[in-house]
Amino acid sequence: FNDDDDQTRWFYFKSNGKKLYADNGERTKDKTINGKKYAFDEYGAMVAEWSLDEDDEKKASDTEAQEAASTASTSEAWEGNGKYAKYTQAWKYYNSVEDGSRVSKGWFKVVPAEMLNKEKYDDDEESWYYADGSGNLYAGEFKTIKGKKYAFRNDGRMLTGLKFIKEGDEDFADVKADDDDSRPFDNEDDFFDNAIEFYEPNGYKCYYFGGDDDGAMRTGKTTINYDGENTSFYFEKSGGKKGAGVTGEKDDKLYQSGMLLKADSDDKYIVVDKATKTVNGKTVVTYDKLDDAKDFMDQDDVVATNLLENTTADTRVNIGNNSNKKAEDLTEAYKISFTQSDEDVKHEYVLVNTSGKVIDSKGKNKDGNDYYYVTDSKGVITNVYV
């Protein structure tokens, strides 16, 4: 719709001299002219920009969507509610008032209709859309276009950047951006906190769709400029979860929702907490970075026995892997064992280095605070000392 009363209007007159217009209660009347599709309203004026197709509107069959189509007053219509994708698919775009021909197939970048997204309409913010060949929008779905996979919000806007998506039965139940008001993930700490505590347990998957004018879904190993730094991610390369961020081990490295868990250059080594629990009848595994050796030994499931108690300077202390040191040469020394403090959650602790490589062999690994993590032949931490 275009509400500018002062603009020039185009009309089409049939061979009998009568103008073409929508009648019999129709919203618009379609006409192919010189191979292009146009639409005319009840007054005969050519439709420009956005139009809601009356026949296609029947796709919006559920009660809430019909209400949104008639009142356009509920915020859910542009907040990612999966019930409204079919309503969006009933919209078509007819270019400018000077042109008016329908975009039948392909990409176009415009400001959304007010009834599709009032906030973006008020801000005069353009977004990318795709018409399916009949002029209808892709909405609430993944689509492969010329060999590349894209995703479209329920209001039709192409997705870009890093997103958490929860799929519904027919469309997207929810899409979260990194600046989400309640559960943001625009820095590493918030990413891990919210991915672990909310997104993964509730069925969301992390995807990356490139920059504002790109939108193509990434797969495999990907470097993203995230929070001002180049950050490594890994997204599924095939199968039903193609494009979803990997949670788990891949090529001897650990990922949470696609983000690589690794020590920074100052820390050298960090411990990752692998937690396994059941949520809504499903097994959920999450991975979280611990701050340092002290944080590791403070975990409820970790028992750190002080080996320097009741020793003298010359006492030989077993620091792991059949190695001994004099007590006077040690500042701290602990024997590490594990228990299960919560019967509903199983914790395992994995040591990783600055490349994210899982330490899975026998050795002594010195972190940035001069703590040594002693690991057995399977990479299990048996001792910590400094």
Language-model features: locations:
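Extracellular adhesion/carbohydrate-binding repeat motifs centered on closely spaced tryptophans
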Residues: F1-V386
